[in-house]
């Protein structure tokens, strides 16, 4: 008999929707960031070399990467505005994006030192972007700082361009940073350098945003970000931003890393913030291995959002890791084939079968958890485990459906998946 004193009230087991931090809605082309809108996934193109003697063909090559990211699910794609050649290429890149059926406004320009000059020399090219990003630490220096910032904001106002004010701990406003460090050194209770660093990031972002508003940029045209590389810094900085303002927030580590490290760092930081209602658009800044597709950063963002139930992009396939009760790799092969089948068919299903992204499929390796896990899915298949005879029980909506036998189990299960999608998502 369970001691009632050891149990919690039933309320402890109730789930409730994430309470989103209230932010302004910023419209970038057809994409809405902030407010109660779904979290927006974005990415950044690595970028192709733009040949000054052949701008158009170079731009078409550049556009291929942007389009690949868009097809992967990136709702906005950022490019570096780092040269005259890129500025000249923008109309051609946008043209290719439009040809592919996407809104050209998904293209976002990331400006650093060069932005002030480029908006003067190529105003008609920059204005067709969906949004521009500026870094207060790199806009200008000395007496030119405020002047350049003001001119860029005035340009954005004139051309109705949303602006992300993106502060980065690797290129902080040196004047603000020195001022805060000097004040801290004179304090009777000085803080650590990490505390001052975080404070500088937040003050730079919010101070720049308020300055932009004073110039005339509407708060509904402003997104802010404070990029760092350490997860705990990310959490503390964005928690402070959320407490201090209602600007739409762009989340992400500035350099997450490569491989598992990058994925884990990104997931740890973003999940905590998103679960606490903080964040309106996200990016996974992963270092891709040579030859690896940049689209992986889009997939990671989608997986994070889906795993915590904020957005759904693809059917969820649950599968066991295997253990001593599974004596062959049959269930792993089946899992891979099921994932591949779903991935191949999703472009069609998304258009033809709305709601299919909520479907749950379970592929289990043995009878210990197989039947139970399968009953929690829309469709589940459970292999017998040790011995691995080609016999698999299939469950549909929590109930036993049929048993598949022989060497064509995947083909038969594939037909069951297809039939379920057609009948349940129309």
UniProtKB/Swiss-Prot annotation:
Residues 1-20 are annotated as: Disordered. Disulfide bonds: none annotated. It catalyses: (2E)-4-hydroxy-3-methylbut-2-enyl diphosphate + oxidized [flavodoxin] + H2O + 2 H(+) = 2-C-methyl-D-erythritol 2,4-cyclic diphosphate + reduced [flavodoxin]. Keywords: 4Fe-4S, Iron, Iron-sulfur, Isoprene biosynthesis, Metal-binding, Oxidoreductase. GO terms for molecular function: 4 iron, 4 sulfur cluster binding; 4-hydroxy-3-methylbut-2-en-1-yl diphosphate synthase activity (ferredoxin); 4-hydroxy-3-methylbut-2-enyl-diphosphate synthase activity (flavodoxin); iron ion binding. Its EC number is 1.17.7.3. One of its GO terms (biological process) is terpenoid biosynthetic process. It is an enzyme of class 1 (oxidoreductase). Binds 1 [4Fe-4S] cluster. Pathway: Isoprenoid biosynthesis; isopentenyl diphosphate biosynthesis via DXP pathway; isopentenyl diphosphate from 1-deoxy-D-xylulose 5-phosphate: step 5/6. Its cofactor is [4Fe-4S] cluster. [4Fe-4S] cluster binds at residues 320, 323, 366, 373. Belongs to the IspG family. Converts 2C-methyl-D-erythritol 2,4-cyclodiphosphate (ME-2,4cPP) into 1-hydroxy-2-methyl-2-(E)-butenyl 4-diphosphate. This is 4-hydroxy-3-methylbut-2-en-1-yl diphosphate synthase (flavodoxin). It comes from Wolbachia pipientis subsp. Culex pipiens (strain wPip). The gene is ispG.
């Amino acid at each position: 008999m369970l001691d009632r004193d050891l149990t919690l009230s039933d309320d402890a087991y109730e789930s409730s929707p994430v309470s989103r931090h209230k932010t302004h809605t910023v419209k970038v082309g057809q994409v809405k960031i902030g407010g109660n809108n779904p979290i927006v996934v974005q990415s950044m193109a690595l970028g192709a070399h733009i040949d000054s003697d052949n701008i158009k063909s170079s731009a078409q090559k550049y556009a291929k990467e942007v389009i690949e990211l868009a097809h992967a699910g990136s709702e906005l794609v950022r490019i570096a505005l780092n040269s005259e050649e890129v500025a000249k290429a923008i109309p051609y890149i946008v043209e290719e994006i439009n040809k592919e059926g996407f809104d050209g406004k998904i293209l976002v320009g990331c400006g650093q030192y060069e932005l002030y000059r480029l908006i003067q020399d190529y105003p008609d090219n920059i204005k067709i972007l969906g949004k521009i990003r500026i870094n207060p630490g790199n806009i200008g220096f000395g007496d030119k700082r405020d002047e350049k910032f003001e001119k860029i904001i005035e340009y954005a106002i004139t051309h109705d361009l949303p602006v992300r004010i993106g502060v980065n701990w690797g290129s902080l406003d040196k004047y603000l940073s020195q001022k805060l460090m000097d004040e801290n050194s004179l304090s009777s209770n000085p803080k650590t350098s990490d505390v001052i660093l975080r404070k500088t990031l937040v003050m730079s972002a919010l101070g720049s945003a308020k300055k932009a508003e004073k110039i005339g940029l509407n708060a509904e045209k402003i997104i802010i970000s404070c990029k760092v590389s350490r997860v705990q810094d990310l959490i503390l900085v964005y928690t402070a931003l959320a407490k201090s303002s209602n600007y739409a927030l762009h989340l992400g580590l500035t350099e997450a890393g490569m491989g598992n490290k990058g994925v884990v760092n990104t997931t740890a930081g973003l999940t905590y913030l998103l679960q606490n209602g903080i964040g309106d658009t996200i990016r996974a800044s992963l270092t891709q291995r040579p030859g690896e597709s940049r689209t992986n950063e889009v997939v990671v963002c989608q997986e994070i959002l889906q795993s915590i139930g904020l957005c759904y992009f693809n059917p969820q396939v649950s599968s066991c890791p295997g253990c001593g009760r599974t004596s062959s790799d049959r269930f792993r092969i089946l899992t891979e084939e099921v994932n591949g089948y779903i991935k191949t068919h999703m472009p069609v299903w998304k258009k033809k079968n709305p709601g299919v992204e909520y479907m749950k499929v379970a592929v289990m390796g043995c009878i210990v958890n197989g039947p139970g896990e399968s009953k929690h899915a829309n469709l589940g298949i459970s292999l017998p485990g040790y011995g691995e005879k080609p016999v698999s029980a299939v469950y549909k909506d929590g109930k036993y459906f049929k048993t598949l036998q022989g060497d064509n189990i995947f083909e038969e299960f594939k037909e069951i998946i297809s039939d379920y999608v057609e009948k349940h998502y129309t």
